[in-house]
Amino acid sequence: MSNNTCKIVLVGDSGAGKTCIISRFVNDRFDKSQMTTACPSFCTKEINYPKYKKTINLDIWDTAGQEIYRSISKLFYKGASIGILVYDITNQKSFESIKEYWYKELKENTEDNTCFMLVGNKADLFEQEQVKEEEAKEYANSINAEYYLTSAKNNIRITDLFVQCGIKFIDPNSNDKNNDNNDEKDGNKNFIINSGENKPKNTCC
């Protein structure tokens, strides 16, 4: 894997919105009826970080339905720099699964220097919230993960999440945080995202 390639894996219960999060970031699309395949798939997105003088390729891996059977191959996790734990804020069980299964699964199958993100998705359904943000933040702190409240449907903090993944890849100890604020003052940007469309690539035939 290239020194400029950041492998990101998303895990969590089926229905939490992992595929929709990826689709929103990579192609700026939302389709809740999007079909999954029987094997993991990945998409690639390129981000340029002028501040760091780096261009990073994000390889974003989706379990694509295998999480239903909890039979994900170790190859899925191999070489991951970032692990994103996704739960549905309207589904308490999906959050409990993160704590009881997915975090341990990630921890056991990734390197010690892998960075973790905890993502509460479906912020657009806030009135149906079952998982309180304070509870999620407390858990994120306990596992040394950064916390994000997102909505793939309304495109809330999706770009922020993945841009931050690139920053953590460049400098795991960085305290820099992207907050959906791409400063263009004096012609400078914190990041520039390649606008090309990407189609998911399956890893099995």
Where are the model-predicted features located?
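Conserved P-loop small GTPase signature centered on TRAFAC-class small GTPases
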Residues: M1-G15, T19, S23-V26, A38, ...
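Post-Walker A helix-loop "phosphate-sensing" segment adjacent to the P-loop in P-loop NTPases
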Residues: N27-M35
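Conserved alpha-helical scaffold flanking the Walker A/P-loop in AAA+ ATPase domains
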Residues: C43, R70-L75
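Conserved catalytic network of the ASCE P-loop NTPase/AAA+ motor domain
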Residues: P50-K53, K74-G79, K107-D112
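Generic enzyme active-site microenvironment
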Residues: N57-I60, V86, V119
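Short acidic active-site motifs
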Residues: I68-I72, S94, E135, R157
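Conserved Switch II/interswitch segment of TRAFAC-class P-loop GTPases
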Residues: A80-E100, T110-N113, A123-Q130, K153
